[in-house]
């Protein structure tokens, strides 16, 4: 404590600390909107933690454009230039590309080993083993539609977003530690052991196949069916571990008694679902119930469990 206060009382050191603190606050986010020279010759570029590049120009010489110390790089919708090994410094943990970025095939070393978050909107090339660093925890590839081989995606991934993926999933394609997953417009067959037992939250939208028992792992606690699908909900197709359940927005057909597991505490019915509630449809564990916008049926006695404390109409 004495050392700290002796330094703090030194007017020169105090002034220097305040100056650097001001530089950091003023330059922690740098937006490049004219040329890359804005970044190369920025007088306080070393203070930047977030860099947003809004232009379509090459990054330039090997590793010279983006300063070491930056932790987040965002390439917006205009950027569409090659990324080479060493261009992104090893301090970067979060990397995002806009919808116009159509990269070449990546090679080992393209991304730094510090990376934990990668979002590539339009990437649609084959991914080979070790091309993505083993540090990635969140991977979002929105327009990706190339077949994935088992054990290619890093085992470190805990959140995976695969939208528009239309190839048959195989065992071990989805990494074993994934806890949150978005699978949008997947239209191939599901089967047992395709999703890992680590999975807790699943967003499964526009799945146009039947859903059967054991297709989804019993580790799932939050299940959202998005816009549409499955074609039918077979008996026990929703895992008995699910606590938060949202049926697909476009679902209109009658939900049979027994389809909602006893574990569900938070239930959202589809906007256009307008069937009378049958006794026994809603589980006794339910505490929160959200009806769809167009629901206008008379609620009969004993259809809503006494455990429900919140109702949204």
Where are each of the predicted segments found?
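C-terminal capping region of solenoid repeat domains
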Residues: 2-3, 15-17, 189, 198-203, ...
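LRR N-terminal entry segment and analogous cap-like coil->beta motifs
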Residues: 5-83, 91-101
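Concave beta-strand-loop units of leucine-rich repeat
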Residues: 32, 51-58, 74-81, 96-103, ...
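Leucine-rich repeat
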Residues: 44-49, 66-72, 88-94, 111-117, ...
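Canonical leucine-rich repeat
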Residues: 59-62, 66, 82-83, 88, ...
């Amino acid at each position: 404590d004495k050392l700290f206060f002796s330094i703090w009382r030194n007017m020169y050191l105090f002034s220097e600390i305040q100056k650097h603190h001001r530089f950091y606050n003023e330059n922690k986010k740098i937006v490049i909107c004219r040329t890359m020279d804005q970044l190369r010759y920025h007088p306080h570029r070393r203070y930047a933690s977030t860099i947003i590049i809004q232009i379509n120009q090459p990054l330039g010489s090997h590793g010279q454009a983006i300063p070491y110390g930056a932790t987040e790089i965002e390439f917006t919708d205009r950027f569409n230039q090659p990324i080479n090994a060493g261009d992104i410094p090893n301090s970067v943990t979060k990397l995002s590309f806009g919808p116009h970025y159509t990269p070449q095939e990546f090679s080992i070393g393209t991304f730094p080993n510090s990376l934990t978050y990668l979002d590539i909107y339009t990437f649609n090339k084959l991914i080979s083993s070790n091309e993505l660093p083993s540090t990635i925890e969140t991977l979002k590839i929105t327009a990706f539609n190339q077949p994935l081989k088992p054990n290619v995606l890093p085992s470190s991934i805990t959140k995976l977003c695969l939208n528009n993926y239309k190839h048959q999933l195989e065992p071990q394609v989805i990494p074993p530690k994934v806890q949150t997953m978005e699978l949008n417009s997947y239209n191939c067959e599901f089967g047992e052991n395709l999703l890992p037992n680590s999975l807790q939250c699943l967003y499964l939208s526009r799945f146009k196949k039947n859903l059967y028992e054991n297709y989804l792992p019993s580790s799932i606690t939050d299940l959202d069916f998005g816009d549409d699908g499955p074609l039918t909900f077979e008996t026990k197709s929703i895992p008995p571990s699910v606590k938060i359940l949202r049926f697909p927005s476009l679902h209109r057909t009658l939900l049979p008694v027994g389809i909602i597991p006893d574990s569900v505490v938070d239930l959202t019915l589809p906007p256009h679902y307008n069937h009378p509630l049958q006794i026994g449809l809603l589980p006794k564990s339910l505490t929160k119930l959200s009806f769809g916008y167009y629901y206008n049926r008379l609620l009969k006695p004993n259809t809503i469990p006494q455990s429900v404390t919140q109702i949204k109409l």
